[in-house]
Design a protein with these regions (language model features):
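Flexible, glycine/charged-enriched surface loops at secondary-structure junctions
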Residues: 113-123, 150, 394-401
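C-terminal edge-of-domain segments
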Residues: 66-75, 82-83, 178-211, 426-440, ...
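A contiguous loop/helix-start segment that scaffolds small-molecule binding in enzyme catalytic cores
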Residues: 28-31, 35-38, 43-75, 162-165, ...
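Short glycine-rich anion-binding loops that position phosphate/pyrophosphate groups of nucleotides
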Residues: 7, 72-75, 95-96, 193-198, ...
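N-terminal glycine-rich phosphate/adenylate-binding segment common to multiple enzyme folds
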Residues: 1-60, 163-212, 286-308
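Class I S-adenosyl-L-methionine
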Residues: 120, 137-138, 143-178, 182, ...
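Class I SAM-dependent methyltransferase SAM-binding "motif I" and its flanking Rossmann-like core
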Residues: 4-7, 224, 296-366
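Conserved mixed alpha/beta catalytic, RNA-binding, or beta-rich assembly cores of soluble enzyme
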Residues: 1-24, 34-130, 207-208, 245, ...
Length: 457
Protein backbone atom coordinates (compact mmCIF):
# COMPACT_ATOMS: atom_id res chain seq x y z
CA UNK A 1 0.00 0.00 0.00
CA UNK A 2 1.02 3.62 -0.55
CA UNK A 3 0.88 5.56 2.71
CA UNK A 4 0.32 9.30 2.33
CA UNK A 5 1.08 11.53 5.31
CA UNK A 6 -0.35 14.97 5.95
CA UNK A 7 2.96 16.52 4.96
CA UNK A 8 2.90 14.64 1.65
CA UNK A 9 -0.64 15.82 0.93
CA UNK A 10 0.20 19.51 1.22
CA UNK A 11 3.65 19.24 -0.32
CA UNK A 12 5.47 20.18 2.89
CA UNK A 13 8.08 17.71 4.07
CA UNK A 14 8.04 16.71 7.71
CA UNK A 15 10.67 18.34 9.91
CA UNK A 16 12.55 15.07 10.21
CA UNK A 17 12.93 15.02 6.43
CA UNK A 18 14.96 18.22 6.21
CA UNK A 19 18.20 16.25 6.16
CA UNK A 20 19.60 16.98 9.63
CA UNK A 21 18.99 15.53 13.10
CA UNK A 22 16.14 17.27 14.89
CA UNK A 23 15.22 17.32 18.56
CA UNK A 24 12.57 18.80 20.81
CA UNK A 25 8.86 19.17 20.13
CA UNK A 26 9.11 17.83 16.59
CA UNK A 27 5.48 16.67 16.49
CA UNK A 28 4.06 19.94 17.82
CA UNK A 29 6.09 22.24 15.59
CA UNK A 30 5.49 19.92 12.64
CA UNK A 31 1.72 20.17 13.14
CA UNK A 32 1.95 23.94 13.40
CA UNK A 33 3.89 24.06 10.15
CA UNK A 34 1.26 21.97 8.36
CA UNK A 35 -1.60 24.01 9.85
CA UNK A 36 -0.05 27.28 8.68
CA UNK A 37 0.46 28.66 12.18
CA UNK A 38 3.24 31.23 12.65
CA UNK A 39 6.58 29.65 13.51
CA UNK A 40 9.60 31.67 14.53
CA UNK A 41 12.85 30.70 12.84
CA UNK A 42 16.25 31.42 14.32
CA UNK A 43 19.47 30.15 12.77
CA UNK A 44 23.00 30.73 14.00
CA UNK A 45 24.41 31.48 10.57
CA UNK A 46 22.93 30.85 7.13
CA UNK A 47 22.94 27.11 6.58
CA UNK A 48 22.05 25.42 3.28
CA UNK A 49 18.76 23.94 4.44
CA UNK A 50 15.81 23.31 2.11
CA UNK A 51 13.08 25.87 1.67
CA UNK A 52 10.60 26.32 4.49
CA UNK A 53 6.95 27.39 4.03
CA UNK A 54 5.90 31.02 4.35
CA UNK A 55 4.50 30.60 7.87
CA UNK A 56 8.06 29.97 9.11
CA UNK A 57 9.20 33.52 9.78
CA UNK A 58 12.77 34.63 10.50
CA UNK A 59 13.26 36.09 14.00
CA UNK A 60 9.56 35.95 14.91
CA UNK A 61 10.29 35.52 18.62
CA UNK A 62 6.66 36.09 19.60
CA UNK A 63 5.36 32.98 17.86
CA UNK A 64 4.24 30.15 20.15
CA UNK A 65 6.22 27.68 18.04
CA UNK A 66 9.92 28.07 17.31
CA UNK A 67 12.35 26.30 14.96
CA UNK A 68 15.99 26.77 15.92
CA UNK A 69 19.13 25.86 13.99
CA UNK A 70 22.00 25.56 16.45
CA UNK A 71 24.73 23.23 17.65
CA UNK A 72 24.30 24.43 21.25
CA UNK A 73 22.42 22.49 23.91
CA UNK A 74 19.09 24.14 24.76
CA UNK A 75 16.29 23.51 27.22
CA UNK A 76 13.62 21.68 25.26
CA UNK A 77 10.25 23.30 25.85
CA UNK A 78 6.85 22.74 24.33
CA UNK A 79 6.67 24.34 20.90
CA UNK A 80 10.44 24.36 20.31
CA UNK A 81 12.19 22.12 17.78
CA UNK A 82 15.93 22.25 17.13
CA UNK A 83 17.69 21.35 13.89
CA UNK A 84 21.28 20.25 14.39
CA UNK A 85 23.63 21.54 11.66
CA UNK A 86 26.81 19.56 10.89
CA UNK A 87 28.95 22.32 12.35
CA UNK A 88 31.44 20.70 14.73
CA UNK A 89 34.77 19.04 14.03
CA UNK A 90 36.46 17.10 16.82
CA UNK A 91 40.24 16.92 16.56
CA UNK A 92 41.73 13.86 18.22
CA UNK A 93 45.28 12.96 19.14
CA UNK A 94 45.96 9.42 20.31
CA UNK A 95 48.70 7.14 21.54
CA UNK A 96 49.15 3.81 19.81
CA UNK A 97 46.64 1.29 21.14
CA UNK A 98 44.06 3.76 22.44
CA UNK A 99 40.61 2.23 22.91
CA UNK A 100 37.45 3.45 21.22
CA UNK A 101 35.81 3.74 24.64
CA UNK A 102 38.46 6.18 25.84
CA UNK A 103 38.13 8.29 22.69
CA UNK A 104 34.34 8.47 22.93
CA UNK A 105 34.35 9.22 26.66
CA UNK A 106 36.67 12.15 25.97
CA UNK A 107 34.55 13.46 23.09
CA UNK A 108 31.32 13.20 25.09
CA UNK A 109 32.95 15.04 28.00
CA UNK A 110 34.26 17.83 25.76
CA UNK A 111 30.85 18.33 24.16
CA UNK A 112 28.92 18.24 27.43
CA UNK A 113 31.20 20.70 29.19
CA UNK A 114 30.98 23.12 26.26
CA UNK A 115 27.18 22.69 26.03
CA UNK A 116 27.43 21.42 22.45
CA UNK A 117 25.26 18.79 20.77
CA UNK A 118 26.69 15.45 19.75
CA UNK A 119 24.30 15.52 16.78
CA UNK A 120 26.21 18.44 15.26
CA UNK A 121 29.53 16.60 15.03
CA UNK A 122 30.48 16.62 11.37
CA UNK A 123 33.53 14.33 11.56
CA UNK A 124 36.67 13.50 13.51
CA UNK A 125 40.06 14.88 12.45
CA UNK A 126 43.58 13.68 13.18
CA UNK A 127 47.08 13.34 11.74
CA UNK A 128 47.61 10.96 8.82
CA UNK A 129 49.96 8.65 10.75
CA UNK A 130 46.91 7.72 12.83
CA UNK A 131 44.82 6.71 9.83
CA UNK A 132 45.16 3.05 10.84
CA UNK A 133 44.62 3.57 14.59
CA UNK A 134 42.00 0.95 15.44
CA UNK A 135 40.58 2.85 18.42
CA UNK A 136 39.97 5.98 16.34
CA UNK A 137 38.48 4.02 13.47
CA UNK A 138 36.16 2.12 15.79
CA UNK A 139 35.09 5.27 17.66
CA UNK A 140 34.15 6.98 14.41
CA UNK A 141 32.34 3.88 13.17
CA UNK A 142 30.22 3.55 16.32
CA UNK A 143 28.91 7.09 15.96
CA UNK A 144 28.62 7.08 12.18
CA UNK A 145 31.25 9.79 11.78
CA UNK A 146 33.89 10.04 9.09
CA UNK A 147 37.55 10.11 10.16
CA UNK A 148 39.55 12.70 8.22
CA UNK A 149 43.34 12.67 8.36
CA UNK A 150 45.83 15.38 7.44
CA UNK A 151 49.63 15.38 6.93
CA UNK A 152 51.92 16.75 9.62
CA UNK A 153 53.20 19.38 7.18
CA UNK A 154 49.70 20.88 6.92
CA UNK A 155 48.99 20.74 10.66
CA UNK A 156 52.37 22.30 11.47
CA UNK A 157 51.28 25.48 9.68
CA UNK A 158 48.24 25.94 11.95
CA UNK A 159 48.57 28.40 14.82
CA UNK A 160 47.33 26.78 18.05
CA UNK A 161 47.06 28.02 21.66
CA UNK A 162 48.66 24.93 23.22
CA UNK A 163 51.63 23.72 21.15
CA UNK A 164 53.87 20.91 22.39
CA UNK A 165 57.52 20.50 21.47
CA UNK A 166 57.34 16.86 22.57
CA UNK A 167 54.56 16.22 20.07
CA UNK A 168 56.51 18.08 17.38
CA UNK A 169 59.52 15.83 17.99
CA UNK A 170 57.38 12.71 17.71
CA UNK A 171 55.15 13.44 14.70
CA UNK A 172 56.45 16.62 13.04
CA UNK A 173 53.79 19.05 14.25
CA UNK A 174 53.42 20.80 17.61
CA UNK A 175 49.72 19.99 17.74
CA UNK A 176 47.43 17.22 16.55
CA UNK A 177 44.03 17.64 18.23
CA UNK A 178 43.82 21.45 18.07
CA UNK A 179 45.56 21.78 14.72
CA UNK A 180 43.41 19.08 13.08
CA UNK A 181 40.20 20.59 14.47
CA UNK A 182 41.12 24.08 13.27
CA UNK A 183 42.44 22.89 9.90
CA UNK A 184 39.25 20.93 9.21
CA UNK A 185 36.74 23.14 10.97
CA UNK A 186 37.63 26.77 11.34
CA UNK A 187 37.45 28.49 14.72
CA UNK A 188 38.52 26.69 17.86
CA UNK A 189 35.76 26.40 20.47
CA UNK A 190 37.30 23.97 22.96
CA UNK A 191 41.04 23.78 23.49
CA UNK A 192 43.10 20.62 23.90
CA UNK A 193 42.19 18.35 26.77
CA UNK A 194 43.37 14.90 27.80
CA UNK A 195 41.14 11.96 28.53
CA UNK A 196 40.34 11.31 32.19
CA UNK A 197 42.32 8.12 32.66
CA UNK A 198 45.18 7.16 34.97
CA UNK A 199 47.30 6.86 31.84
CA UNK A 200 45.82 9.24 29.29
CA UNK A 201 46.04 7.99 25.71
CA UNK A 202 43.79 10.53 23.94
CA UNK A 203 43.53 14.28 23.55
CA UNK A 204 40.68 16.20 21.98
CA UNK A 205 39.66 19.66 20.82
CA UNK A 206 36.59 21.07 19.06
CA UNK A 207 36.31 23.62 16.27
CA UNK A 208 33.22 25.05 14.61
CA UNK A 209 32.89 24.56 10.89
CA UNK A 210 31.73 27.79 9.31
CA UNK A 211 28.47 27.53 7.32
CA UNK A 212 29.09 26.95 3.64
CA UNK A 213 26.56 27.39 0.90
CA UNK A 214 25.74 24.56 -1.46
CA UNK A 215 25.33 24.75 -5.23
CA UNK A 216 23.73 21.80 -6.98
CA UNK A 217 24.12 22.01 -10.77
CA UNK A 218 21.29 19.91 -12.12
CA UNK A 219 20.60 18.49 -15.56
CA UNK A 220 16.85 18.07 -16.06
CA UNK A 221 17.17 15.72 -19.02
CA UNK A 222 15.43 16.11 -22.38
CA UNK A 223 12.06 17.14 -20.98
CA UNK A 224 9.90 14.14 -20.10
CA UNK A 225 9.23 13.85 -16.37
CA UNK A 226 10.04 10.13 -16.32
CA UNK A 227 13.52 10.92 -17.68
CA UNK A 228 14.28 13.27 -14.77
CA UNK A 229 16.60 11.29 -12.51
CA UNK A 230 15.68 10.46 -8.89
CA UNK A 231 18.83 12.26 -7.74
CA UNK A 232 17.76 15.41 -9.57
CA UNK A 233 14.36 15.29 -7.85
CA UNK A 234 16.04 14.93 -4.46
CA UNK A 235 18.32 17.89 -5.11
CA UNK A 236 15.42 20.05 -6.29
CA UNK A 237 13.60 19.30 -3.03
CA UNK A 238 16.74 20.09 -1.08
CA UNK A 239 17.16 23.56 -2.57
CA UNK A 240 16.00 26.80 -0.98
CA UNK A 241 16.77 28.78 -4.15
CA UNK A 242 16.22 27.71 -7.78
CA UNK A 243 18.04 29.54 -10.58
CA UNK A 244 17.29 28.81 -14.22
CA UNK A 245 15.70 29.65 -17.54
CA UNK A 246 12.05 30.51 -16.97
CA UNK A 247 10.70 27.61 -19.04
CA UNK A 248 12.83 25.10 -17.11
CA UNK A 249 11.78 26.55 -13.75
CA UNK A 250 8.14 26.23 -14.78
CA UNK A 251 8.81 22.64 -15.85
CA UNK A 252 9.82 21.50 -12.35
CA UNK A 253 8.03 24.01 -10.12
CA UNK A 254 5.53 21.42 -8.89
CA UNK A 255 8.40 19.34 -7.44
CA UNK A 256 9.70 22.10 -5.18
CA UNK A 257 9.05 22.68 -1.50
CA UNK A 258 6.66 25.49 -0.59
CA UNK A 259 8.68 28.62 0.08
CA UNK A 260 11.39 27.88 -2.48
CA UNK A 261 12.72 31.14 -3.93
CA UNK A 262 12.69 31.20 -7.75
CA UNK A 263 15.19 33.25 -9.79
CA UNK A 264 14.00 32.72 -13.36
CA UNK A 265 15.21 34.65 -16.41
CA UNK A 266 14.53 34.60 -20.13
CA UNK A 267 16.46 33.04 -22.99
CA UNK A 268 20.15 33.88 -23.03
CA UNK A 269 21.78 35.42 -19.96
CA UNK A 270 23.59 32.17 -19.07
CA UNK A 271 26.44 34.04 -17.39
CA UNK A 272 23.99 36.18 -15.43
CA UNK A 273 22.16 33.09 -14.18
CA UNK A 274 25.44 31.46 -13.18
CA UNK A 275 26.51 34.60 -11.30
CA UNK A 276 23.16 34.76 -9.50
CA UNK A 277 23.51 31.15 -8.38
CA UNK A 278 27.04 31.74 -7.12
CA UNK A 279 26.02 34.87 -5.20
CA UNK A 280 23.27 32.94 -3.40
CA UNK A 281 25.58 30.00 -2.63
CA UNK A 282 28.21 32.36 -1.23
CA UNK A 283 25.55 33.76 1.11
CA UNK A 284 25.18 30.25 2.51
CA UNK A 285 21.98 29.09 0.84
CA UNK A 286 21.17 25.73 -0.72
CA UNK A 287 20.97 26.61 -4.42
CA UNK A 288 20.01 24.60 -7.48
CA UNK A 289 21.14 25.85 -10.89
CA UNK A 290 19.09 24.02 -13.50
CA UNK A 291 19.26 23.41 -17.24
CA UNK A 292 18.11 20.91 -19.82
CA UNK A 293 19.94 17.72 -20.70
CA UNK A 294 23.15 17.32 -18.72
CA UNK A 295 24.46 20.48 -17.06
CA UNK A 296 28.01 19.63 -18.09
CA UNK A 297 27.21 19.25 -21.80
CA UNK A 298 26.69 22.68 -23.41
CA UNK A 299 25.06 23.54 -20.09
CA UNK A 300 25.29 25.68 -16.99
CA UNK A 301 28.11 23.84 -15.22
CA UNK A 302 30.84 25.52 -17.24
CA UNK A 303 29.87 29.18 -16.65
CA UNK A 304 29.12 28.41 -12.99
CA UNK A 305 32.47 26.77 -12.29
CA UNK A 306 34.71 28.83 -14.54
CA UNK A 307 35.56 31.19 -11.68
CA UNK A 308 34.87 28.83 -8.75
CA UNK A 309 36.80 29.96 -5.67
CA UNK A 310 36.10 27.08 -3.29
CA UNK A 311 34.04 29.13 -0.82
CA UNK A 312 30.94 26.92 -1.14
CA UNK A 313 30.20 23.27 -1.82
CA UNK A 314 29.36 22.07 -5.34
CA UNK A 315 27.37 19.00 -6.34
CA UNK A 316 26.93 17.92 -9.95
CA UNK A 317 23.77 16.02 -10.87
CA UNK A 318 23.99 14.32 -14.28
CA UNK A 319 21.08 14.31 -16.68
CA UNK A 320 20.12 12.44 -19.84
CA UNK A 321 21.51 14.41 -22.77
CA UNK A 322 19.73 15.34 -25.98
CA UNK A 323 22.19 13.10 -27.85
CA UNK A 324 21.47 9.98 -25.81
CA UNK A 325 17.73 10.66 -25.85
CA UNK A 326 17.84 11.03 -29.63
CA UNK A 327 19.98 7.92 -30.02
CA UNK A 328 17.43 5.83 -28.12
CA UNK A 329 14.75 6.91 -30.59
CA UNK A 330 16.89 6.28 -33.67
CA UNK A 331 18.10 2.81 -32.72
CA UNK A 332 21.81 2.43 -32.03
CA UNK A 333 23.55 5.18 -34.01
CA UNK A 334 26.33 5.70 -31.44
CA UNK A 335 27.48 2.11 -31.18
CA UNK A 336 31.03 3.14 -32.00
CA UNK A 337 33.17 6.27 -31.56
CA UNK A 338 31.10 9.43 -31.70
CA UNK A 339 31.33 13.12 -30.90
CA UNK A 340 29.07 16.11 -30.38
CA UNK A 341 29.63 19.45 -32.08
CA UNK A 342 27.65 22.64 -31.55
CA UNK A 343 27.13 24.61 -34.75
CA UNK A 344 26.32 27.82 -32.90
CA UNK A 345 28.96 30.46 -33.55
CA UNK A 346 27.73 32.64 -30.69
CA UNK A 347 30.67 31.60 -28.49
CA UNK A 348 32.92 29.80 -30.99
CA UNK A 349 34.06 31.32 -34.32
CA UNK A 350 32.98 29.39 -37.40
CA UNK A 351 36.55 28.62 -38.57
CA UNK A 352 37.13 26.67 -35.34
CA UNK A 353 33.81 24.83 -35.68
CA UNK A 354 34.68 24.03 -39.29
CA UNK A 355 38.06 22.65 -38.22
CA UNK A 356 36.38 20.35 -35.71
CA UNK A 357 33.84 19.12 -38.26
CA UNK A 358 36.67 18.33 -40.69
CA UNK A 359 38.52 16.39 -37.98
CA UNK A 360 35.37 14.39 -37.17
CA UNK A 361 34.88 13.69 -40.87
CA UNK A 362 38.45 12.46 -41.38
CA UNK A 363 38.27 10.41 -38.17
CA UNK A 364 35.01 8.77 -39.31
CA UNK A 365 33.18 9.68 -36.11
CA UNK A 366 29.43 9.46 -35.76
CA UNK A 367 28.52 13.12 -35.25
CA UNK A 368 25.70 14.69 -33.25
CA UNK A 369 25.09 18.31 -34.21
CA UNK A 370 23.70 20.49 -31.42
CA UNK A 371 22.21 23.93 -32.20
CA UNK A 372 22.13 23.02 -35.90
CA UNK A 373 20.05 25.84 -37.35
CA UNK A 374 18.20 28.99 -36.28
CA UNK A 375 16.41 31.87 -38.01
CA UNK A 376 19.52 34.00 -37.97
CA UNK A 377 21.96 31.16 -38.67
CA UNK A 378 20.77 29.03 -41.56
CA UNK A 379 23.87 27.99 -43.54
CA UNK A 380 26.21 26.31 -41.03
CA UNK A 381 24.46 22.92 -41.01
CA UNK A 382 24.54 22.69 -44.81
CA UNK A 383 28.26 23.49 -44.82
CA UNK A 384 28.95 20.90 -42.12
CA UNK A 385 27.05 18.20 -44.02
CA UNK A 386 29.05 18.92 -47.18
CA UNK A 387 32.29 18.56 -45.21
CA UNK A 388 31.18 15.18 -43.86
CA UNK A 389 30.09 14.03 -47.31
CA UNK A 390 33.67 14.38 -48.54
CA UNK A 391 34.71 11.48 -46.30
CA UNK A 392 31.75 9.08 -46.13
CA UNK A 393 29.26 7.42 -48.50
CA UNK A 394 26.30 9.25 -49.99
CA UNK A 395 24.02 6.67 -48.37
CA UNK A 396 25.29 7.41 -44.85
CA UNK A 397 22.27 7.34 -42.50
CA UNK A 398 21.16 10.58 -40.88
CA UNK A 399 18.61 10.94 -38.09
CA UNK A 400 16.74 14.14 -37.29
CA UNK A 401 15.18 14.10 -33.83
CA UNK A 402 13.12 17.08 -32.78
CA UNK A 403 11.95 17.66 -29.19
CA UNK A 404 13.00 14.22 -27.96
CA UNK A 405 10.71 12.88 -25.20
CA UNK A 406 8.33 15.84 -25.43
CA UNK A 407 4.76 15.91 -26.73
CA UNK A 408 5.88 17.42 -30.07
CA UNK A 409 8.58 14.76 -30.59
CA UNK A 410 9.33 13.78 -34.20
CA UNK A 411 11.89 11.44 -35.77
CA UNK A 412 13.01 11.57 -39.40
CA UNK A 413 15.38 9.12 -41.09
CA UNK A 414 17.21 10.16 -44.24
CA UNK A 415 20.63 9.93 -45.86
CA UNK A 416 23.49 12.38 -46.07
CA UNK A 417 23.05 13.09 -49.80
CA UNK A 418 19.27 13.30 -49.54
CA UNK A 419 19.45 15.85 -46.72
CA UNK A 420 22.00 17.95 -48.62
CA UNK A 421 19.84 17.79 -51.75
CA UNK A 422 16.44 18.50 -50.20
CA UNK A 423 17.75 21.10 -47.78
CA UNK A 424 17.60 21.60 -44.04
CA UNK A 425 14.76 24.11 -43.75
CA UNK A 426 12.81 21.80 -41.42
CA UNK A 427 15.67 21.69 -38.91
CA UNK A 428 15.60 24.13 -35.99
CA UNK A 429 17.20 24.66 -32.57
CA UNK A 430 15.01 21.94 -31.05
CA UNK A 431 16.42 19.37 -33.48
CA UNK A 432 19.41 17.12 -32.95
CA UNK A 433 21.06 15.94 -36.18
CA UNK A 434 22.88 12.60 -35.96
CA UNK A 435 25.10 11.64 -38.91
CA UNK A 436 26.38 8.06 -39.01
CA UNK A 437 29.90 6.95 -39.90
CA UNK A 438 31.01 5.04 -42.98
CA UNK A 439 29.73 1.72 -41.60
CA UNK A 440 26.39 2.92 -40.20
CA UNK A 441 23.26 1.68 -41.95
CA UNK A 442 19.52 1.28 -41.62
CA UNK A 443 18.29 -2.06 -40.29
CA UNK A 444 14.52 -2.45 -40.57
CA UNK A 445 13.89 1.20 -39.79
CA UNK A 446 16.60 1.47 -37.14
CA UNK A 447 19.79 3.50 -37.52
CA UNK A 448 22.65 1.26 -36.41
CA UNK A 449 26.41 1.71 -36.09
CA UNK A 450 28.18 -1.59 -35.34
CA UNK A 451 30.68 -1.93 -32.52
CA UNK A 452 33.31 -3.08 -35.04
CA UNK A 453 33.91 -1.67 -38.52
CA UNK A 454 32.82 -4.89 -40.21
CA UNK A 455 29.29 -6.23 -40.03
CA UNK A 456 29.02 -9.75 -38.63
CA UNK A 457 27.77 -12.25 -41.17
Amino acid sequence: PVITTASDAVGISALDQLGWPIEGDVAGVGRAMLDGEPIGFLSEGIWPIPALPENVEVDNFGASNQLLVTDRLVDFQEGVAVLRPPSLVVGVGASRGVSADEVLELIDSLLADAQLSIYSVRHLATIDVKADEVGLIEAAKRRGWALHTYPASALAEVSVPNPSERVRAEVGTASVAEAAAIFAGGSLLVGKRKSNRDVSMATGAIARHQPRGRLAIIGLGPGARDLLTPRAKEELRRAAVIVGLDQYVEQIEDLLRPGTRLLATGLGNEEERARSAIVEAKKGYAVALIGSGDAGVYGMASPALEDFDGTFDVVGVPGITAATAAASLLGAPMGHDHCSISLSDLHTPWPIIEQRVKAAAVGDFVVSFYNPRSKGRAWQLDSALVLLAEHRPATTPVGLVRAASRSSESVTLTTLTELITTGTAAVDMFTLVVVGNSSSKFVDGQMVTPRGYDWKS
